From Swiss-Prot:
MF (Gene Ontology): dihydrolipoyllysine-residue succinyltransferase activity
Record pathway: Amino-acid degradation; L-lysine degradation via saccharopine pathway; glutaryl-CoA from L-lysine: step 6/6
Assigned protein family: Belongs to the 2-oxoacid dehydrogenase family.
The protein, known as: Dihydrolipoyllysine-residue succinyltransferase component of 2-oxoglutarate dehydrogenase complex
Record bears the keyword Transferase: yes
Keywords, sorted A to Z: Acyltransferase, Lipoyl, Transferase, Tricarboxylic acid cycle
The keyword Methyltransferase is assigned to this record: no
InterPro entries: 2-oxoA_DH_lipoyl-BS (IPR003016), 2-oxoacid_dehydrogenase (IPR050537), 2-oxoacid_DH_actylTfrase (IPR001078), Biotin_lipoyl (IPR000089), CAT-like_dom_sf (IPR023213), E3-bd_dom_sf (IPR036625), PSBD (IPR004167), Single_hybrid_motif (IPR011053)
Coiled-coil region: none
Domain called Peripheral subunit-binding (PSBD): residue spans: 113-150
Biased composition (Polar residues): 85-97
Enzyme Commission number(s) from the entry: 2.3.1.61
Modified residues (N6-lipoyllysine): K43
Amino acid sequence: MGVKIIVPSLGESVTEATIAKWYKKEGDAVKTDELLLEIETEKVTLEVNSPCNGTIGKIIKADGANVAVGEEIGDINEGEAVATNSNEAAKPQTASQPVPEKVPKKPAVANNTLAPSVQKLVTENKLDPNNIKGTGKDGRITKGDVLETMNAPTPAATSTTSSAKASEERVERVRMSRLRKTIAQRLKDSQNTAAILTTFNEIDMSKVIALRGKYKDEFEKKHGVKLGFMSFFVRATIEALKLIPSVNAEIDGDDLVYKNYYDIGVAVGTEQGLVVPVVRDADKMGFADIEKTIGGLAKKARDGKLSMADLSGGTFSISNGGVYGSLLSTPIINPPQSGILGLHKTEERVVAIDGKIEIRPMMYIALSYDHRIIDGKEAVSFLVKIKELIESPEKLLLNL
C-alpha cells in the first residue's frame, strides 16, 4: 500500500482549503521533501512536500478541488526515485565516430513548475522565466524573484518586434481564488454586522518629519533597519488604545471583551489581495523592533510565505493607503475587531497657524469604528490623541 498524501494542519480554526496546483502527475518520480502541490486557504498558500522517495501512485483530488484537513488527496509508491524519461538513457558510441562537444544549455523552466501566483505575474508582464534567477528551494522562482527582475534595468532592444498580436479578448473570466472570495465575504460581513461609522482628523507632520530626517541615518546604522513613519503611528495608536479601551474591544454575543494586550494588524497589499499580518505585543516593542517586524511581515506577504500564525488574531488594524497616493478613505473594519485606523498621503497644504498663513505637510487620518461598542466622543478622542502624539513626537519617546 502506498504512502498517503494528506492535507496538513492549516492552523487554528481553518478546516478547508483548495488545491491550487499539482506539480507532479501520476507516475512521476519524487524525492523526500520535493514539492508536490500547493493548497490555498482563506489567507495563505501552502506547499505540500513529498514525505518519502518514490513515484506518484494515484492523484485523488485534482486542481481546484476543495479538501479538508487530514483528507487523503493522493498516494506515493515508496521506493527509490527513478528517472521517468527512458529516452535519456545513454547510448554507446562507436570509436570511429567521435561525439562532437556541445555547449551546455541552461535547462528551460517549465510553466507547470511555477506557482500559480508566480505564473500569473510572469504572464501578465510578458517575462521569460528562463531569464529569472530563482532563489527559492531547489532553485524555484518566487514572486520576489519576479519583482526583482521587473525592477531591474533592461538593456536596449537589439531587434525589431515580431508582427502585431491579434487583438485581445475584451472580456476575461477568471475564477476567484479562495483568498479573494474570503476577502469579499469578510468585508461584506463586516458591513452587514457592524454599525460602521468613520470620523476624521488631520495631522501636521512637520515635527515627525524633522525628527526622522535628523536621526534616520544614525538609527539605520545602529539598528540595521530604516526608520519609517509606521513605527510612530503604531506607538501612538497603542497609547490611544490605552486611553480609549473600547476601541481595543470586541463584541462576543451579549458580552464586551476588553483586551489588555495590543496585537496590531498592518494591512499589506499583495498580488493575490489584501492581507493583514499581526505585530504581536506591539506595546512591548521599541521603534526598531516594530520596523523590523513590519518589514519582515511585508516581505513574507509579498513572497507568499506568510503562515497562519502571522495572520491570526489582532486587536486593532492600521491601513496605509497613502503609499498608493490615497488622500482620503473610509477603511472597513476587520472583524471581529471594532476599529481600523486609515493613514493617507502627506501633502503640503495651506493652513492657518497662530493667525498666520503657512504651508505645512499635512495628513488626513480616519478611524472607522463599530458604533455599537464605541461612542462618537470616544472615536474623536482616539484620533485627537494620535494627532497630539504625532505632532509632538517627543512625547512618544518620553512616554508622556
